[in-house]
Design a protein with these regions (language model features):
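Transmembrane alpha-helical cores of Major Facilitator Superfamily
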Residues: 53, 57, 83-91
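Multi-pass alpha-helical transporter architecture, strongest
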Residues: 33, 39-40, 117-139
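Interfacial helix-cap and linker-helix signal at transmembrane-aqueous boundaries
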Residues: 6-7, 11, 100-108
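Hydrophobic/small/kink-forming positions within alpha-helical transmembrane segments
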Residues: 1, 37, 94-95
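C-terminal transmembrane helical hairpin of 12-TM major facilitator-type secondary transporters
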Residues: 18-65
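Cytoplasmic loop-to-transmembrane helix junctions
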Residues: 20, 77-84
Length: 139
C-alpha cells in the first residue's frame, strides 16, 4: 500500500510515471533482495524476523511499480491483464514450496533457498528497470 501512495505523490509532484514506476519497483526488489541475502548469516531469530519484515515492507513499496503497471498498459483491460498475470504468478506460488521442500530435504539448509529468492528479486528488479513501459499496449 505504501508504494502506491509514494508513487502517486511523486507523480502528482510532476515526476514522469515511468520513472516513478521503475524507481519504486527497483527500491522494493533490490532492497528486499539485500535483506534476504543477509538472512542466512544471522544467528539471532530476532534479526531474521526484522530482515523478513523489511523484505515484506519493501515488497509493498514495489507494488507501486509492477503492481499498478497493468493499468498503464491497458486501461480498458486492466482486470483481464491483472487476472492473466496473477494466474501466471500463481504457478510460482504452487511450485515454490515444493522446490523449497526438496532443497531442504537434500541440503538440510535454508541457505540455497534464500540465495535463489535473492537472485529472483535481483533479476526481476533489473528486468523491470530495463524493460518496463507505461505506453498503452492494449486498446
Amino acid at each position: 500500500i505504501s508504494g502506491g501512495y509514494l508513487a502517486d505523490s511523486l507523480i502528482k509532484k510532476g515526476f514522469q510515471v515511468l520513472i516513478v514506476r521503475k524507481a519504486v519497483n527497483t527500491i522494493g526488489f533490490l532492497g528486499g533482495a539485500a535483506c534476504l541475502s543477509m538472512i542466512p548469516f544471522q544467528d539471532s531469530y530476532i534479526s531474521i524476523i526484522v530482515l523478513l519484515s523489511f523484505t515484506n515492507a519493501l515488497s509493498g513499496i514495489a507494488v507501486g511499480g509492477f503492481g499498478v503497471n497493468h493499468a498503464d498498459l491497458g486501461p480498458k483491460y486492466t482486470g483481464s491483464i491483472v487476472g492473466f498475470a496473477g494466474g501466471i504468478g500463481m504457478i510460482a506460488a504452487i511450485i515454490s514450496p515444493i522446490v523449497a521442500g526438496l532443497i531442504l530435504e537434500l541440503t538440510g539448509s535454508w541457505f540455497l533457498i534464500f540465495n535463489i529468492s535473492t537472485f529472483i528479486l535481483v533479476f526481476g528488479g533489473i528486468f523491470y528497470l530495463f524493460f518496463a513501459d507505461t505506453k498503452i499496449q492494449f486498446e
